[in-house]
Amino acid sequence: MVVQAPIQLPFRILGETADLIAIDKPPSLLIHPSKPGGPVTLWDRLRELLAYEIASGGQVSLINRLDRETSGIVLVAKNAQAARHCSMAMARGEIAKEYLALTVGWPKSEEWSVREPILRLGEVEDSRIWLKRGVHPMGVPAHTDFRVMKRIMHPKVGPISLVHCIPHTGRTHQIRVHLTHSGYPVVGDKIYGPSEGCYLEFIETGWSAALAEKLWLPRHALHSCSLRVALDKVQHSWNSALPDDLLRFLIGSPEGC
């Protein structure tokens, strides 16, 4: 009898039901393959993990997606019925998602909301980064609520904040765009941080000491920390704590006011 080695998962499983599985995605793990022969992705390992469900006719579907550098909760449906239910719930705004972000600066208010439309900037102006978004009156409606959880004086960066973010719509880069629009960009953000040149430099050279001086972190400090959805009248919820790389960044940083 051939005994197969256990699958080495590059992520943690937060919880699983007959219909759903919640994944805690680490930073820098791609969701989908970007090119043939590229690095292992979350989708690759999911298909291995759920091989039995797939072989039995199951339809594995990602309910939400995270940018490569964003860490945290990714919800996966294990069959077509659950995928359809969750997709409809998402469209109705009935899947509650929450994030934690480390931002540059101390916001003037403890809580604030941003209701500003977002579009891809290349649609209305010259942009060196095709995927870059921005606030623009011709964009689609977007709404995010923010609350300051902690103000910190970081020894390298200066004033930074731990901000709780609740997106009520699901636009690409929404939280990052709305935080930058508010004047408090996400720490480590190559596109919406100090200069979009950081992103272009990273594409050209990879992570470097020069970029570390400008960005402080090799990835943007955004983490999906909570997700809730009801399925068949049962409320499901999952939580994910701030990951180690962001916690290490905060070590030795005295709390501010």
Q: Model-found features: residue ranges?
A:
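RNA pseudouridine synthases
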Residues: M1-C257
